[in-house]
Amino acid sequence: IYWMFTKIFYKYSSSIAVVADNGQKLTYAELGEMVAAKAATFTPYVLQFCLCENNLESLVFYLACLDAKAPVVMLDAKKDAELLDHLRNIYRPGETICHEDLAVCLTTSGSTGSPKLVRLTLDNLRSNALSIAEYLHIDEHERAITMLPMYYSYGLSIINSHLIKGATLLLTDKTYA
């Protein structure tokens, strides 16, 4: 991926990148191939919606958007259909041309209780991932469980900070009380 993961896919090519809920394991090389194939279906700078679940499909979609320079709005796959239609009408995914620096939009309720989008650049994502990885001493021996949704900033930062260091992600939507 042009902004930070390409060399990681090669450097850790034989290491396990992802373990899915169903037990499926992917190496960094395999994940990189899936991401490249999906990225080829996107147009640079054209907005995409990712209806997120903590699964392989959503992870590949997110990474492919970054690879293709296609800004992505990360949304809860279980969002109310009426709200999703409203967001589609406003933002027109697949049609809207975005600024070249825009990488990801995350929803926040803000102070009004209605969804707002926070815009993040590639530099924002990279510096956040590297800062977290450095502070927590994350390396290729770490394994992170995706307990938080990837459409949350904290959930996404866990993904980015672990992938950038060649660690393993354990993808799950399960919650434990």
What are these regions (language model features)?
Residues 27, 103-130:
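Conserved AMP-binding A3 loop
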Residues 65, 108-111, 144, 150:
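Conserved S/T- and glycine-rich ATP-binding loop of Class I adenylate-forming
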Residues 39-78, 147:
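Conserved AMP-binding/adenylate-forming
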Residues 11-43, 81-88, 96-97, 120-123:
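Conserved AMP-binding/adenylate-forming core of the ANL superfamily
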Residues 5-7, 56-74, 133-134, 153-165:
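Hydrophobic alpha-helical segments in the ANL/AMP-binding
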Residues 34, 52-53, 73-87, 167-177:
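ATP-dependent adenylate-forming carboxylate-activation enzymes
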Residues 1-16, 97-103:
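A short N-terminal helical cap/helix-turn-helix that marks the beginning
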Residues 126-143, 153-177:
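Conserved AMP-binding/adenylation subdomain of ANL enzymes
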